Amino acid sequence: MAGTNGGGAFLLVYIFFTIAIGLPVMLAEFSLGRRSQQNALGTFRVLAPGTKWFLFGLLSIIAAALILSFYGTVSGWTLEYVWLSISNSFQGQSAEDSIFTNFISHPYKALLWHIGFMFLTGAIIMGGVQKGIERYSKLMMPLLFIIIIALSINSMTLSGSAEGLRFLFFPKLSELTADSILSALGQAFFSLSVGMGILLTYASYIPKNDNLTGISLKVIITDTLVAILAGIAILPAVFSFHIDPQAGPGLVFLTLPKVFQGLPAGEIWAILFFILLTFAALTSAISLLEVPVAYLVEEKKLKRPWATVIATLVITCIGSFNTLSFGPLRHVQIFGMSLFDACDYLCSNILLPLGGILICIFAGWYLDKSILYSEISNNGSLKTRFFRLAPICIFLILLNVLGII
């Protein structure tokens, strides 16, 4: 995202949104979820009985499912590239070679990886939060952090890496546009998992004596640190090998194999990097799938295995259309966008900011403030004006992008 939206300027706006808007929205979601001890829909059914607020909970569940439908597509690509790295299939290939294009446009190969990734996610989440999610997260996240630090150190030793670091850390505010600002907001929401029901659902598992402010700050600091390390790991290497930083998804799947060929022990670095991507994708997918699964278990009273199977199958089917939009369904367009791009745009630019606005309005204006103060375990030092300010900021950004102001 930083490569396609101005580098350091995008990073600066992203960090600002993460702290100024992401923190209060996250605190609001944590507070509501822990207070209700319910899923995304049940939270509003319990805290706002007899109202239409439950529809926002339903919207959050739909948003999580749609995000996972296209996220599973990209995650399937990472599995393919793990295999290509292990089999050393990149050897002798140039950045212009069409391994990636041939793969995603193949009639069924990308689809099989998408299905495989989704069923792997379902198998993990079937065990529940503690047996499934927590166990694998404790293994994957420290390993992810170690790998990305190693890649960052290696990347900074490359010739010409200073240019990449300059691109990342010296912002050019003139390159910011309304669209890139909205992208930074959407990326902040996506990386923090706010506005899509994940935090509402996970907060129902948080013990009552845990400090929500401390948890939120730890999440934001860790997320921001990982984002910066990822930029250090990728962008200096990209500039070192004279690759266009605005390549977007192609930056990873089209050009980085070429980058790894020029590194000492490049095969090992390639394997580590794409395993890193797979781990990151899997942890996010697990969180997204838990939202509809928790809804089916708590609202529809299904057993967790059946709820997981149903949610996984439905999302996999939707995601299959997104996956095939690069191949057999590439001519199908919605408002001039492919199925994949349309789904991405709907979620990132509309549903997530809208979710952030609604959660802040509910917490800052509708809900009894005593509930927030009793849940936020910092002796009431967080004032509700943060919740009143956040939706206004988000709303103004949306109006600006739409050309209304």
Question: Across the structure, where does each feature detected by a protein language model lie?
Answer:
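Inter-helical loop and helix-membrane interface segments of multi-pass membrane transporters/permeases
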Residues: 2-5, 40-59, 72-130, 162-182, ...
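Extracellular loop-to-transmembrane helix junctions
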Residues: 3-28, 109-110, 348, 352-355
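Select transmembrane alpha-helical segments in multipass membrane proteins
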Residues: 9-13, 51-65, 112-117, 176-185, ...
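Juxtamembrane transmembrane-helix boundary signature
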Residues: 13-48, 237, 241-244, 361-365
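C-terminal membrane-solvent junction of multi-pass transporters and transport-like membrane proteins
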Residues: 56-59, 302-312, 344-394
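Loop-to-transmembrane helix boundary motifs in multi-pass membrane proteins
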Residues: 110-112, 222-228, 267-270, 279-282, ...
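Membrane-embedded translocation segments of transport machinery
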Residues: 134, 138-282, 306-307
